[in-house]
Amino acid sequence: HPEREMTFIGVTGTNGKTTTTNVIKHILTANGYLVGLIGTIQNEIGDQILHTDNTTPMVYDLMALYRKMADAGCDYVVMEVSSFGLVQHRIGPTHFRAAVFTNLTQDHLDYHKTMEAYYQAKKMLFSITDYALINIDDDYGKRLAGEVTCAMETYGISSKADYYADAIKLRANGTSFWMCYGGKSYPVEIQMTGMFNVSNVLAASAVCMELGLTNAQVLQAVQKCRGVRGRCEVIPTGKPFSVICDYAHTPDAIENILKSVKEYTEGRLICLFGCGGNRDKTKRPKMAKAAAAYADFLVITSDNPRDEDPNAIIQDILAGLAGSTIPYEVVVDRKEAILRGMQ
């Protein structure tokens, strides 16, 4: 039973899981703990990187991974907990010391069929945790906050939350804000940008304080956290323009990243994106509509079509631009599309 030998922190939600889990790991590691990480990009035991196939591994793989982490001396395990993992009972007998709900927006409806079923899948995590931290900027988060039976706190940009952000200043290379809780405010400077990252850092900070770290320990560590590759990642180019790579693959995520970047963009905002194959088709036109609302020019391309025809996927995307006046180009080959976007 390696799951009895470590303390578990779970993070669930449509967007923000990877960044939030990585910031939690960074804070705990900076304060002397050995931490295991289980997530979308990779699994980690301290600095050791392990390959992953699923956000939440199958139960037999997960238990083997737990054993490696326990034998290595991990104090904590921070994991992304997917809706698939919960519905399919992949996490087995794992009990969580703390669990975070980031948000719930359209995704995986090819599997869950309805948003209600998707919500109920996410909610399962909060029946196996001692403490819940819930984002009440999100409508489903507000609902969840009224339904959980464990100890609970809330976070968000809204001042109605237990942990909230004030005086937020976004820049191309970072963000500053005041973290407010318990009637006090603390200045925070992070090397990440985007309103969504303010929310992710709030969540990670609140969880670590719940685990017993002081605000000074948390905030000192947060300032040195650089974020996650492929999550609002600024790519150095040496050119007179900025390039940002982001994982946004839902309508809400597209809107969030473009809305944030738009705030400090000088000149045009060019958005290059595609949609994955063999996944929820109904979000494709919605992603295009979200992109058209904030970008000045779109480059529409292929993004891991799997078994589908890339051109058919692009036609689904273009349906979302009906009636829009935004200029766009279709370049099916992704490498050529990136070159075109740079040009």
Give, region by region, the residue ranges found by the protein language model.
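Walker A (P-loop) phosphate-binding motif
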Residues: 1-43, 48
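Acidic, Mg2+-coordinating active-site environments of NTP-dependent enzymes
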Residues: 5-6, 72, 96-242, 266, ...
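Residue-level signal for inorganic ion chemistry
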Residues: 11, 38, 62, 80, ...
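Conserved nucleotide-sensing/catalytic segment adjacent to the nucleotide-binding pocket
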Residues: 50-82
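Switch II (G3) loop of P-loop NTPases
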Residues: 74-84, 242-249
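Conserved helix/coil segment N-terminal to the catalytic DExD/H
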Residues: 84-92
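Active-site beta-alpha connecting loops in nucleotide-dependent enzymes
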Residues: 228, 254, 258-324, 334
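C-terminal structured "cap/appendage" subdomains that terminate the fold
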Residues: 321-343
